[in-house]
């Protein structure tokens, strides 16, 4: 076996890409060769670290988003005594608040990350989330302001931070990822959403068990007053407050993550810094340390010679005035929008749906059993459906491909919602629960994962974060439509003492229509597996012959590199 060559400044563990290509003067060629090394790098601990840093933040996002159905249930008990539930308008407003803030964060942080850099924004959005989460847990009403209004305010602010995390986590992961496993890495980050949902269900279960004695005293939610109401008040504050813990753990690592080499190459045009940042990432350092004089000269040359267009408003509109690029953005944005209409319409109403199908209330003798059944029901949905769906995507997305998974997911979800909607009155509660669990599985082994992954791959570096943010924002606009306009229709025609959700079957039928529309928009997106980000975005267009030539060039340059490096060091 031949001994692998080591370039100056490298070792067996950490290869020095900077010295590999130090002798190459053309900044475009250095960029291509250095990024090829990133794309071809074997999967290592530095990739695991990138996924973990992005994933812990996404875990926090998911926990905070999906505790809302539990939050509104408990707020209804505490602040609406005698009724046991809050008005539908208040329930909807709290759920919409996070989505409204998320739209702002996705567009704002997405654009800012393209202007100021990924590193500059990463961590700032997490500060929003941590602060707003703690503020919610400590919130209290007063004679002059209602607790519902206070919660809505803080959830909007929290949503801004959550929104910023979508484009940043996706883009940073994709730009650091090896081409072969980029889908799995991005899918693993997104799969933390399932673990966040699972954690929310477990925390709810534990606090319910902890206050069992106080909760058992009230036979119904409406009669939960006194010690029972105090217990529920402590419960919702605990459930919300715990969401700040993983964010605090992830904050340091986000603030110290290096800038992505692609951004430094293509937007900053800082060739020397980007080359050193690649090495810094692999060694766990926050930033590369190139020679400052060499860096300044190289940057000046790159400004003149780089083939990649400079980012500007004019270039942005020129780029998306081309039909191909506009249709691509429409494909990612509309697919996400149609998905979230149904996904958030049902997922943020898990507690309501469990109640509708009788799972949480049937046979329940007191408030404790209702809340316990709700927590266990959420655990069943997440463990049996959501979590497996996420991880099946992680293990198949780089072999099956993004587009087939999205087609399959939308298609099967259309069928499941048609069955739930049109056969709603003929299905038993257990059958409805089983179909609902299947729907959660195919949301996540389907478009919920792929709509996050694809926008992080197909757009050029200079507009990648903005475009991902716009796509994600359309998704959250869809969730606002699903929660604000469609989900409340379930109460249409309700009479006091009767079925509180007589229109639930028609709501599910409407969701089926949007899943069918998602099948159509999937035709607008390309297959992205095993292709470099530059191939997908058209930043350089390689045929098979050109790619083979590039591989030959890469080998030749790396063979020459030790000699050149030695000359530099001499």
Curated annotation (Swiss-Prot):
Describe what happens without this gene. Impairs growth at low phosphate conditions when pho-4 is also absent.
Disulphides: none
Per UniProt, the ranges with Polar residues bias are: 561-570
Q: Which GO terms describe its biological process?
A: phosphate ion transport
Q: Where in the cell is it found?
A: Cell membrane
What induces its synthesis? Transcription is controlled by the phosphorus-acquisition regulatory system.
Pfam families on file: Sugar_tr
| A GO term from the CC aspect | plasma membrane
Where is the sequence biased in composition, kind Basic and acidic residues? 547-560
Topological domain, Extracellular: which ranges? Answer: 83-95, 142-143, 208-237, 347-374, 425-433, 490-505
Q: Keywords in UniProt for this one?
A: Cell membrane, Membrane, Phosphate transport, Symport, Transmembrane, Transmembrane helix, Transport
Q: Which InterPro entries match?
A: MFS_dom (IPR020846), MFS_sugar_transport-like (IPR005828), MFS_trans_sf (IPR036259), Phos_permease (IPR004738), Sugar_transporter_CS (IPR005829)
Q: Which CDD domains match?
A: MFS_PhT
Primary site of residence: membrane
- Domain of life, per lineage: Eukaryota
- Matches recorded under Gene3D superfamilies: MFS general substrate transporter like domains
Q: How is its activity regulated?
A: Phosphate transport activity is competitively inhibited by arsenate.
Instruction: Give me the segments passing through the membrane.
Output: 62-82, 96-116, 121-141, 144-164, 187-207, 238-258, 326-346, 375-395, 404-424, 434-454, 469-489, 506-526
Topological domain spans for side Cytoplasmic:
1-61, 117-120, 165-186, 259-325, 396-403, 455-468, 527-570
The record's GO molecular-function terms, alphabetically, read: phosphate transmembrane transporter activity; symporter activity
Membrane topology value: Multi-pass membrane protein
In this chain, the stretch annotated as Disordered covers 537-570
The protein's job, in short, is: High-affinity transporter for external inorganic phosphate. Acts probably as a H(+)-phosphate symporter.
Question: What family does the entry list?
Answer: Belongs to the major facilitator superfamily. Sugar transporter (TC 2.A.1.1) family.
Spell out the protein name for this chain: Repressible high-affinity phosphate permease
Q: Which gene encodes it?
A: pho-5
